[in-house]
Every structure is written in C-alpha cells, then in structure tokens.
Amino acid sequence: MSDQVMPTGQNPALQIRNLDFFYGDFKGLKNVNLDIAQKKVTAFIGPSGCGKSTLLRTFNRMYDLYPGQRAEGEILFHGKNLLEKSQDVNLVRAKIGMVFQKPTPFPMTIYENIAFGVRLYQRMSGSAMDDRVEWALKKAALWGEVKDKLNQSGLSLSGGQQQRLCIARAVAVKPEIVLLDEPTSALDPISTAKIEELINELKSDYTIAIVTHNMQQAARISDYTAFMYLGELIEFNETGTIFMRPGKKQTEDYITGRFG
C-alpha cells in the first residue's frame, strides 16, 4: 500500500523512497514513500506501535545507537542518501535536529545546555556564543523567562520550559529540519499551547516533522498529515484533506474513533 503514496510539493526537504526498517528480523517499516515539504509542518499519526516514531528516527539515523536495527532504501537530503554508511551521522544530526517526548535538558546550566551542542560543530568567541545562546532562546520563545538566570540549572525549569530549552538546543546549531517526537505528551495544556504556537512560528525558518498521538494537535498545527498503521504509510495528504475528506477507510475510521 505504501508504494502507492505519491510525494507532495516541490523541492522537498527530504525524499523517502522504498524505505524498510528492521528490528532484528522484524520489519517495522514497509516500503514507505513520501516527501517532506520544506518549511512546512508534517505530522505523523496512527495507533501506538504503527511505526511513526520509528520513521521519524530514520530521518537522522538515531537508530544507529541501537544494535540490531537497520534501514534499507533511500532518504534523500540534498540529493544524497542519508542511509549510506559513508555519511557522517554527526553532521546529519546537526542538520536534522530532534526533540524527544520527555524534556531532556542536560544536567548543566541553561546557558551551557545551548552552548554545549554548538561547540561540537563550531568554534566561536565568547561574545559570539553569548549571541548564539540568546538567539536560540529567543527562537524558542524562552529568552524573556530565563535571561536573568542563565547560570541556573536547566533542570530547575518547569516541564514546559525544559521542552522549549530542548527546542532551543536543537535550533542553536542551525539545522534545516527539526524532528519532534510527541513533544507535548508529557506537558500540561498551557505548556502544550505554547509549544504549538512556537511550532507555528518555527516553520518560517525550519522544516518540521512531528509525531503526535493527538489528532486534534495534528489538525491544528500541521500542513501535511501522514496516517500510519502496522509499519505502512496508509495515507498522506494535506492535513485538511486527511481530516475532512480522507481517501482510505482505515484513515476515516481512525480519525473518527471507529478504528479497530
């Protein structure tokens, strides 16, 4: 079924072609094909275990951290296949940043949470680093809340602030793509609303791919939505079409709560 899903848009940020993914001998993704549009929000929805987070983690090869996992096919980024072993995965992850389900600030100051990643890829003066930290925190709509306590621990922040700190950390290295794996599932409604507002602002500068279990969230913030089930991409289209005029019965059943 997945091989029938055509890519959308022109000059995509990522092109996924004939992608399979394996956990040992188990096939977790089956022939996934789609394009991720530049400077748009693409949401991945589907029941638990459908492969949406697995797919997201292939985009910057996070699976390399786990023995026995492998991907086959192509993920094209500027015309080069990210799955080739010759790719420098550290550079891939600099260009394709990731924010996880639970806030994961480093056990260091707010300032160092931002500066640490930047130093891995760039040499700059102290004043330039100060500017980069401020820039990243402003991008994550956090500067006004933390500018007077940059030397305090990132762990001292609230859950919602910690997640925005993680977003600031991701954008500080100036990626092209930001991956968000259920970034609000551990947050309260007010913090969730702030993250959603932030995502809407960030897409003017970054391509964003988000996994969410919250269909209303996907409908609110995304331009494109992909519905996945049992490792297959069942349907992919503009978000309004997916939610108002789905082309597949499985999609309709899922978004109307009749799935199963």
Swiss-Prot record:
Residues 14-255 form the ABC transporter domain. GO terms for molecular function: ATP binding; ATP hydrolysis activity; ATPase-coupled phosphate ion transmembrane transporter activity. GO terms for cellular component: plasma membrane. Pfam families: ABC_tran. It is a peripheral membrane protein. Its EC number is 7.3.2.1. PROSITE patterns: ABC_TRANSPORTER_1 (PS00211), ABC_TRANSPORTER_2 (PS50893), PSTB (PS51238). It comes from the Bacteria. One of its GO terms (biological process) is phosphate ion transmembrane transport. It is found in: Cell inner membrane. ATP binds at residues 46-53. Disulfide bonds: none annotated. InterPro entries: AAA+_ATPase (IPR003593), ABC_transporter-like_ATP-bd (IPR003439), ABC_transporter-like_CS (IPR017871), P-loop_NTPase (IPR027417), PstB-like (IPR005670). SUPFAM superfamilies: P-loop containing nucleoside triphosphate hydrolases. It catalyses: phosphate(out) + ATP + H2O = ADP + 2 phosphate(in) + H(+). The keyword Transferase does not apply. Part of the ABC transporter complex PstSACB involved in phosphate import. Responsible for energy coupling to the transport system. PANTHER family: ABC TRANSPORTER I FAMILY MEMBER 17, PHOSPHATE IMPORT ATP-BINDING PROTEIN PSTB. The complex is composed of two ATP-binding proteins (PstB), two transmembrane proteins (PstC and PstA) and a solute-binding protein (PstS). Belongs to the ABC transporter superfamily. Phosphate importer (TC 3.A.1.7) family. This is Phosphate import ATP-binding protein PstB. The gene is pstB.
